[in-house]
Amino acid sequence: MVLAQRQKEELNRAIADYLFANGYVKALNAFREESQLAGENDRKYDGLLEKKWTSVIRLQKKVMDLEAKLNEAEKEFQSMQNAIGFGVAGAAPGSGLSDRSDRRDVDAIPRPPAKFTLTGHRSPITRVLFHPHYNVFVSASEDASIKVWDYETGEFEHTLKGHTDSVQDVAFDPSGKFLASCSADMQVKLWDFTIYQCIKTLTGHDHNVSSVAFLPSGDFLVSASRDKTIKMWEVSTGYCTKTFIGHTEWIRSVRPSPEGNLLASCSNDHTIRIWSVESRECQVVLRGHEHVVECIAWASHPQNLNSLPSSMNSSLLLVSGSRDRTIRFWDVNIGICLFVLIGHDNWVRQLVFHPHGRLLLSASDDKTIRVWDLKNRRCHKTLNAHSHFVTSLDVNRLAPYAITGSVDQTIHIWDCR
């Protein structure tokens, strides 16, 4: 394979950085002369060769694993054909083939014991989040760092340093190229995740920044703060383009709607507000919680919630968790609470919908995660997840894994089955 001139230049500089970092001075001087490298290396080449090398090894392992799974799937497919006399594509309605597949998806929830327990942070974990495309996830902590991990092997990959106080939240853009983080240092940082480098620092909040999220387009991100405001930032320039004002206390979380035209925010003032992105006006105030509202999440598949009246299947549905220990389900269009889920014995800290939308997972200070059956509006399973408060939870959309983070400074990776 022939490399383009720019690729050759990047490879040569990565090699030069490797030689310099390892003290191979004679080899470095000879290499610079032979390759005609001029000037000093940019910081973006720091450790680049090692990163590429480990990435290649990880991808090779991934390819081998996928090939093995493909072989197993082909064998299973062949055995099914032999057993029933026709292919899966020809399965008749009610034959049970698709039903079994659906049941496997429904049952794919975290099961004990934890596959891996990861340590490395020196303070409580504040957020865990899967990458939208790669087999890695990130963890944020009160130790002011963000760490990158391989969820299939449990191996540590990298540490992102730059914040000077507790990192409160992280978010990936839809492409997975950019990571946003926010901190008690009053800053929002934008990282190029492909090279693990901070490319922008966004300033403007006057207090702890507690939440950050990208709009679905990826062109803008929003942040919420203890200064009682929400700010919208243009990713390409880093400029603040809008400020949303209305909450009377610390805003704990902000989340854009699936279409990106609305924002939902929750606060210490016990309310949830729905905002128009275009006009910046608050359209609805949702009241009902009796304590701080810690977390919110939009239902991305309301049509799958067949416990609701059919007239509501196209509604905008939002779920919220509070220090009052309850989870509330809201119809945003008409501003009413549809039902309340009760079961946790302490603050509800994080809410995540299962990929198919019919289950909800919650993390709590009662040290558990709960799986809720939304059709029957009851707790389907309780998992004793950590030895201390469970602060964060995420479910992978592409692979059968879940992750949790805790005040006990550990991260657990769970198999979903």
Swiss-Prot record:
Coiled-coil stretches are: 54-86
Which GO biological process entries does UniProt record here?
cell division; establishment of mitotic spindle orientation; microtubule sliding
Family that this chain belongs to: Belongs to the WD repeat LIS1/nudF family.
Predominant location: cytoplasm
The subcellular localization recorded is: Cytoplasm, Cytoskeleton; Cytoplasm, Cytoskeleton, Microtubule organizing center, Centrosome
What is the phylogenetic placement of the source species in the record? Eukaryota, Metazoa, Spiralia, Lophotrochozoa, Platyhelminthes
What is this protein's function? Answer: Positively regulates the activity of the minus-end directed microtubule motor protein dynein. May enhance dynein-mediated microtubule sliding by targeting dynein to the microtubule plus end. Required for several dynein- and microtubule-dependent processes.
WD repeats, residue ranges? 120-159, 162-203, 204-243, 246-285, 288-340, 343-382, 385-417
User: LisH domain: which residues?
Assistant: 7-39
Q: What is this protein called?
A: Lissencephaly-1 homolog
Name the domain of life. Answer: Eukaryota
Any GO CC annotation of this UniProt entry: microtubule associated complex
